[in-house]
């Protein structure tokens, strides 16, 4: 699969799936952190979410391997970007069924400057409506996140009318430098 160093490895008899992933160098830039498939005797027996270990220290799903087990790192799944007043702005991989609140949790939640009542959703996958959508935090747990979403958590005091945002034209070299 999408490991940095794919191949067959000899591991100790007490090695876990995480040990094997580390031995393989982890997922490469195109590999999933959210769905490491563990196969035994030709059938999938576990699906390890490395985010649970890396972001929360939880080792559930990290089973002890047996001889001839196969780990498969599939390609990265759908991703969302979380920006603004969060603990860790980044692009995060989604698992099926995750919500906007789940994506916010992946980013470490709101920081001390955040407006705790609302977020702005830019749904880039919706070609019929490119307008930003204001989402109340109370609704974030029931609103599904979709690949390509950009979720912005605003700071307290930020004024925003979602339908009034117009993207700025990128500066060109010609008009970015004054020649006076």
PLM-predicted stretches and their roles:
Residues 1-180:
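Ser/Thr/Pro/Gly-biased, low-complexity, turn-/loop-rich segments
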């Amino acid at each position: 699969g999408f490991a940095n160093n794919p191949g067959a490895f000899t591991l100790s008899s007490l090695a876990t799936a995480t040990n094997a992933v580390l031995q393989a160098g982890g997922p490469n830039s195109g590999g999933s952190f959210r769905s490491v498939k563990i196969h035994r005797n030709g059938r999938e027996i576990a699906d390890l979410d490395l985010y649970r270990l890396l972001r929360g220290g939880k080792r559930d799903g990290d089973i002890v391997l047996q001889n001839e087990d196969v780990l498969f790192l599939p390609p990265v799944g759908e991703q969302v970007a979380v920006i603004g007043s969060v603990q860790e702005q980044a692009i995060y991989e989604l698992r099926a069924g995750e919500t906007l609140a789940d994506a916010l949790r992946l980013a470490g939640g709101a920081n001390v400057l955040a407006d705790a009542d609302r977020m702005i959703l830019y749904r880039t996958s919706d070609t019929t409506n490119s307008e930003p959508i204001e989402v109340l935090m109370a609704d974030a747990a029931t609103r599904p996140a979709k690949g390509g979403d950009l979720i912005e958590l605003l700071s307290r005091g930020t004024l925003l009318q979602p339908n009034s945002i117009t993207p700025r034209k990128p500066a060109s070299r010609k008009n970015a430098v004054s020649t006076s």
